[in-house]
């Protein structure tokens, strides 16, 4: 309690020492020291984290110099002091974003900026497709064109097929005039008649090649057959025609037979056909 009373008593004494004249406020006197450094202890105290627990410094023990004189003019409040600029923190909130620091801290980059692509690649995942203009979906149009290109099969009546088959048996190839005459008689187009004759010729060629191959196989199998004598019981021989040029040096033996062992060529010379 005693210290508070001493502080309160010291305020009027300070008013007698300091002179609040226009010259002292404007700093015109050469002998008087500037008053600005006296405000630094208060700023240091306000910027400290634990200002209440810290002990006051040596310069802080005379708060009488900050007490306003009730009889003199009021000193301007320290709130109106120009804030100290900190370039590393950027522009203050009240400045409205003006100045070079605001333009440097803007997060938006134009697409033509060289760092724009690097930033986009860093933000987008590796497997995600990059955003771009959507390609038109032409799947439906392609399917429609594919369906239109597919040829339809012409269905012929029995009378038309009979007339076409009869003409094909007589002549495999038709001239343009014959094709036009046949198409007009059957109420068909020349393209339909031409396509039918092409398919019929292909079928006819396949049939010919199959028949020729079957004939060749039969002829080859007939050439490999050779007649040989077969032995049945009672030594009866089944006479099979064998060329006389075939001769075997080893004699043939027949069981339970009265014939002597003779060479095969001698046996066939004695047999009557």
Curated annotation (Swiss-Prot):
One Gene Ontology term, aspect cellular component: nucleus
Tissues expressing the protein: Expressed in the developing CNS, including a specific expression in vestibular structures throughout inner ear development.
SUPFAM superfamilies attached to this UniProt entry: Homeodomain-like (SSF46689)
Keyword Aminoacyl-tRNA synthetase appears in the UniProt entry: no
GO annotation terms (biological process): brain development; cell differentiation; cell population proliferation; epithelial cell proliferation; inner ear morphogenesis; positive regulation of epithelial cell proliferation; positive regulation of mRNA splicing, via spliceosome; positive regulation of stem cell proliferation
Record keyword Transcription regulation present: yes
Molecular function terms, GO-annotated: DNA-binding transcription factor activity, RNA polymerase II-specific; sequence-specific double-stranded DNA binding
Subcellular locations according to the entry: Nucleus
UniProt xrefs under PANTHER family: HOMEOBOX PROTEIN HMX (PTHR46110), HOMEOBOX PROTEIN HMX2 (PTHR46110:SF4)
Record protein name field: Homeobox protein HMX2
Native species: Mus musculus
């Amino acid at each position: 309690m005693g210290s508070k009373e001493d502080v309160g008593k010291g305020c009027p004494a300070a008013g007698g020492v300091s002179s609040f004249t226009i010259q002292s406020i404007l700093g015109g006197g050469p002998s008087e020291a500037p008053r600005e450094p006296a405000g630094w202890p208060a700023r240091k105290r306000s910027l400290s984290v634990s200002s209440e627990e810290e002990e006051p410094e040596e310069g802080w023990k005379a708060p009488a110099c900050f007490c306003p004189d009730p009889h003199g003019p009021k000193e301007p409040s320290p709130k109106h002091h120009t804030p100290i600029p900190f370039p590393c923190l950027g522009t203050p909130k009240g400045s409205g974003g003006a100045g070079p620091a605001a333009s440097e801290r803007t997060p938006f980059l134009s697409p033509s900026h060289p760092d724009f692509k690097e930033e986009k690649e860093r933000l987008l995942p590796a497997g995600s497709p990059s955003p771009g203009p959507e390609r038109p979906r032409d799947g439906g149009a392609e399917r429609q064109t594919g369906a239109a290109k597919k040829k339809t099969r012409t269905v012929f009546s029995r009378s038309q097929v009979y007339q076409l088959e009869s003409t094909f048996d007589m002549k495999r190839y038709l001239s343009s005039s014959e094709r036009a005459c046949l198409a007009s008689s059957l109420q068909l187009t020349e393209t339909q008649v031409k396509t039918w004759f092409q398919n019929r010729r292909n079928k006819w060629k396949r049939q010919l090649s199959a028949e020729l191959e079957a004939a060749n196989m039969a002829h080859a199998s007939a050439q490999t057959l050779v007649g040989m004598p077969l032995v049945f019981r009672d030594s009866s021989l089944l006479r099979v025609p064998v060329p006389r040029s075939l001769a075997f040096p080893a004699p043939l033996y027949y069981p339970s037979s009265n014939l002597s062992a003779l060479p095969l060529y001698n046996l066939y010379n004695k047999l009557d056909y």
